[in-house]
Structures are given as C-alpha cells and as structure tokens.
C-alpha cells in the first residue's frame, strides 16, 4: 500500500482494495462507487491494482487531478481511511464512512467509524436512510471548524511570501548556519 498516510493514521487498516470491495458489495444496484486516487499517489500502485478495480462492476475511477469538491457534492456519502477527504466531506455537509481508527473526525456525529464487512453493511444502510436535513451535518461542520480554528494561526503575508524566494532563501541560510555550527562545535 503506497499511501504513506495509511501507515501512520490507520496502521491496522491499510488495505484500500479490501475496503473498496466491502463498500461496492454493500451499495444498492443503482449506486456507483467513485474511487479517486490522491494525485501524489497516482502511478505508484501497480497497473494490476487499477485493472482489478476496473473489473468491479459498480466502481469507477476518477481522474486523480479532478476537483474533490465536485465529487463530494454529488455523493450520497464519502468513504475515507485517512487524508483530507473525510474533513472536506464534513465541510461540504456529507456524511463519512471512516475506516481510519485514529481520525479525529470520528468523534463527529456524521462520521461513522467501521472496521468490518458487517459494520460496513449496517452503516451503509444507515447512511442511505439518513435525513440529509438533519442538524447533525451543520453541527459536525461547526464543531470541526471551531476545533481547527482554535489551533490555527493567521498568516496574513503568506500570499505575498509565496511569490518570493526570500523566505526560502532566509530559512535555507538559517538551517545552513545551524548545521555549520553543529559540525564546527564537534570538530
């Protein structure tokens, strides 16, 4: 499994192919599971991996560089192991089927952590019957937003600094000085 975040956030559940099979087997016949690879991971997996996915009748592969927001907005719910898709789904008022045991979003009322095929089946049935007008979607988004804002800080000149190499050069010089001083002191 090339997705490095799976090994850190969900070491006990890192087989994405198995999860895709579980979800696809439990969806109604008229529902398609769209699988979107992280653009940075695309091409790392073997061709056989993608060929196996294409053989599953209700699975479609999205272009890795497509906008995630569009897929989430058109979904009934999203499936996440780790990464940002679960967080984005909460922000876009969509429930999440989570396989990442240690994801902080699992504490939100519209995120459903599962760890087995039977839990997947029961939770998908629950998600398909979920009242989309429920206040839980707004509550989840508000709680997540407030939690993120409470541990964030403002970077008012970020856009200005991104256009300049100054910050990179300055940080590089500081790090070079530190390395030099460490080695000089040891000699």
Give residue spans per PLM region.
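Nucleotide-activated donor-binding/catalytic signature segment of Leloir-type glycosyltransferases, i.e.
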Residues: 47-62
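Short acidic-hydrophobic, aromatic-tinged amphipathic segments that line or gate anion-handling sites
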Residues: 60-63, 111-123
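A donor-sugar binding/catalytic signature common to diverse glycosyltransferases
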Residues: 64-111
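Short low-complexity, flexible loop/linker segments enriched in glycine and/or proline
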Residues: 49-51, 78, 111-115
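C-terminal amphipathic helix plus adjacent low-complexity
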Residues: 117-187
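Conserved catalytic-core segment of nucleotide-activated headgroup transferases in glycan assembly
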Residues: 1-48
